[in-house]
Amino acid sequence: MNIKPEEITSIIKSQIEGYESKLETVDSGTIIEIGDGIARIYGLQNCMAGELLEFPNDVYGMALNLEQDNVGCVLLGSEEGIKEGDIVKSTGKVVEVPVGEEMLGRVVNALGQPIDGKGPIKAEDSKPVDIKATGVIDRQSVNQPLQTGIKAIDSMIPIGKGQRELIIGDRQTGKTAIAIDTILNQKGKDVICIYVAIGQKQSTVAHIVNTFEEMGAMDYSIVVAATASDSAPLQYLAPYSGVTIAENFMFKGKDVLIVYDDLSKHAVAYRTMSLLLRRPPGREAYPGDVFYLHSRLLERAAKLSQKLGGGSITALPIIETLAGDVAGYIPTNVISITDGQIFLESELFYAGQRPAVNSGISVSRVGGSAQIKAMKKLSGTLRLELAQYRELAAFAQFGSDLDKESKKRLEKGKRLTEMMKQPQYKPMPVEKQIMILYAVVNEYVMDIDVSKLSAFESGLFEYVDAHYRDLGKQILEKKELTDDISSQLTKAINEYKKIFLAEEQ
């Protein structure tokens, strides 16, 4: 084999001609102060707001304060082994979270990393966590119902797809229970659910995940968890990560339900971060932009126009009040951002009225237009009747003689209140809600003892399933109480009532 020297020289010459000298410059700075998960860095002249910064030991931080001669940064990991004088590099990127179908059925942290021990997630894409909400032109008004499976809510405080409905109440009044029941009720309805746990105990999150797995809800759900043991920056990021994952599905034309549990702890995490960054405190020591913190998050829930696929994000933020004080700073902020609120009362809860929804203060500002006609017709006077009942019940405590009409109202009110009770993890399909509502509202159950009403309810459903099999299907298809459906319902209720009363004797 002959090797010609000319060939070798020509190859070397072409290599030399094609050589490009590449110098990679990285903007870097020096840590001048570190502690409590906050670092101050000197240098980083070209740093962006919210930029991801690379620290030693593979730890990343997020630049939040851009000051004249230094950058205030929150660490998204442990500060162990990082000290003053260490070099910090800018990455030119902002915080992103993985998105896509692969996230379904997984439990992830605020950065979208799996924490359920089921291996890595091969996500199709990643998106920045903090982006601008969809504009007004790209939205349409709320027009489809999102059934929670809870009688008190679906009848009096209806929620539509694309709505933001606040769940507010003291601790231990069943706020999370309502959110979980709503997620369980989406089974088979082609709605993707995202549960964001902020500042909760790990045991609580584990219990919720177990419930989802037992009930088969994990197939269409994603859990984003920033627990009490996580740092304030991760608790701050969690809801934004959750809604970014949700937006990816929404822009593909899908319906998403997202629960933020809860935004009170989110505001506290942001306050912690802001005070450590030495931002000036305002009312209750919260920073001045705490309203914007929640408004930019909740404005990302929307019902997209048909041109963009008609997808939606329905948000259920949760706020914890102290001793029923809805006039606090964070509660009033979130009430003014959302499209209505479900107010839970501890007095009702301890009196055995569960879910403990106070229908007098609770309201849904846009859900009424999404409610199905049958439910709208039945629940039209419900709120008023319950309010009148409460007023009468308070008056009747004084033992004064009541006229016949007032006694009748009291008896009907008792049955309406009893009918609204519902066990946890037992969401009810809308057609069954309509059946029992029809029976109580039209006074077919006045001769049934209040304590026997729940037994009558479950018996009625069994009777209808056995003898009027198509009735539920007809209600779902027609979505209104036609004369035919009404007469069938009346017949079924009266037939079963005879059997029920005969058995009771």
UniProtKB/Swiss-Prot annotation:
It is found in: Cell membrane. Gene3D superfamilies: 2.40.30.20, ATP synthase alpha/beta chain, C-terminal domain, P-loop containing nucleotide triphosphate hydrolases. ATP binds at residues 169-176. Transmembrane segments: none annotated. One of its GO terms (molecular function) is ATP binding. It holds the Pfam family ATP-synt_ab_C. Its main location: membrane. GO terms for cellular component: plasma membrane; proton-transporting ATP synthase complex. The record marks 362 as: Required for activity. CDD domains: ATP-synt_F1_alpha_C, ATP-synt_F1_alpha_N, F1-ATPase_alpha_CD. It catalyses: ATP + H2O + 4 H(+)(in) = ADP + phosphate + 5 H(+)(out). It is an enzyme of class 7 (translocase). It is a peripheral membrane protein. The keyword Translocase applies. InterPro entries: ATP_synth_asu-like_sf, ATP_synth_asu_C, ATP_synth_asu_C_sf, ATP_synth_F1_a_nt-bd_dom, ATP_synth_F1_asu, ATPase_a/bsu_AS, ATPase_F1/V1/A1_a/bsu_N, ATPase_F1/V1/A1_a/bsu_N_sf. Keywords: ATP synthesis, ATP-binding, Cell membrane, CF(1), Hydrogen ion transport, Ion transport, Membrane, Nucleotide-binding, Translocase, Transport. Its EC number is 7.1.2.2. F-type ATPases have 2 components, CF(1) - the catalytic core - and CF(0) - the membrane proton channel. CF(1) has five subunits: alpha(3), beta(3), gamma(1), delta(1), epsilon(1). CF(0) has three main subunits: a(1), b(2) and c(9-12). The alpha and beta chains form an alternating ring which encloses part of the gamma chain. CF(1) is attached to CF(0) by a central stalk formed by the gamma and epsilon chains, while a peripheral stalk is formed by the delta and b chains. Produces ATP from ADP in the presence of a proton gradient across the membrane. The alpha chain is a regulatory subunit. Belongs to the ATPase alpha/beta chains family. This is ATP synthase subunit alpha. The gene is atpA.
